Amino acid sequence: MNSTMSDEPDALSVVNQLRDLAADPLNRRAIVQDQGCLPGLILFLDHPSPPVVHSALLALRYLAECRANREKMKGELGMMLSLQNVIQKTTTPGETKLLASEVYDILQSSNMSDMDNVNEMNYRRRKAQFFLGSTNKRAKTVVLHIDGLDDSSRRNLCEEALLKIKGVISFTFQMAVQRCVVRIRSDLKAEALATAIASTKVMKAQQVVKSESGEEMLVPFQDTPVEVEQNTDLPEYLPEDESPSKEQDKAVSRVGSHPEGAASWLSTAANFLSRSFYW
């Protein structure tokens, strides 16, 4: 990479931009169909910086939510092998191992029979737990209803708050119903998520639970903040002057509303990836 150009994007800013675009369901097909972005995300899985690897996995997790993408993603050169390497590498943080295993499970199950699918996913989970070690327990899912989660800038604030919590593996926003589905380590309390979201000063979280009759209920968290262990190995995800919040509406709507704009940005990302990895 040519570091002499002051306007040259670095690896973290590029992968974060891809992650933010992949967070919007309208963009997922276009990103996977682009010739440079999916191979680039695979190469990022072998990047020496843990935040780059984790952000690439979040992007892949978003892309894999689109069923139409899964076969192409699974068949992309190096995808499954790179995911295995992340899971098995001894230096990979525990949350990153779990996220890589989750993406692997989704892609591996894309063309299996139901029984093969169950057996393979159970095997992957056992293997991930082995590499995580005895101090890391199985992940759990927490569904949050977030008052105030009503636009893209609020979503970015919420995302930044969650990324700072040690033990958060992945999350998916459901903006239409003001919800966020969060995968966390089982030893992390859901109250920590509420504390982090409350720290934004403009949003407040309640937990969505099901009653015995199957009806959904909103359960408020205690008003007393709990101590949140910070994810010290991750930098602030984007520097303030590069934060996507100011341009989020424009950036996220590009694929659906302005294909030429999205193509231009994806081309820029692909050129960066080409210069960085293929010489």
Swiss-Prot record:
ARM repeats: 36-78
Keywords: Cytoplasm, Membrane, Mitochondrion, Mitochondrion outer membrane
UniProt keyword Membrane, yes or no: yes
GO-annotated molecular function: metal ion binding
A Gene Ontology term for the protein's cellular component: mitochondrial outer membrane
One Pfam family recorded for the sequence: Arm
Gene3D superfamilies: Leucine-rich Repeat Variant
Domain of life: Eukaryota
Compositional bias annotation for Basic and acidic residues: 243-252
SUPFAM superfamilies listed in its UniProt record: ARM repeat, HMA, heavy metal-associated domain
Subcellular location: Cytoplasm; Mitochondrion; Mitochondrion outer membrane
Entry-linked InterPro entries: ARM-like (IPR011989), ARM-type_fold (IPR016024), Armadillo (IPR000225), ARMC1 (IPR016617), HMA_dom_sf (IPR036163)
Region span, Disordered: 236-257
Subunit structure: Interacts with mitochondrial contact site and cristae organizing system (MICOS) complex components IMMT/MIC60 and MICOS10/MIC10. Interacts with mitochondrial outer membrane sorting assembly machinery (SAM) complex components SAMM50 and MTX1.
Role noted for this protein: In association with mitochondrial contact site and cristae organizing system (MICOS) complex components and mitochondrial outer membrane sorting assembly machinery (SAM) complex components may regulate mitochondrial dynamics playing a role in determining mitochondrial length, distribution and motility.
Designated name of the protein: Armadillo repeat-containing protein 1
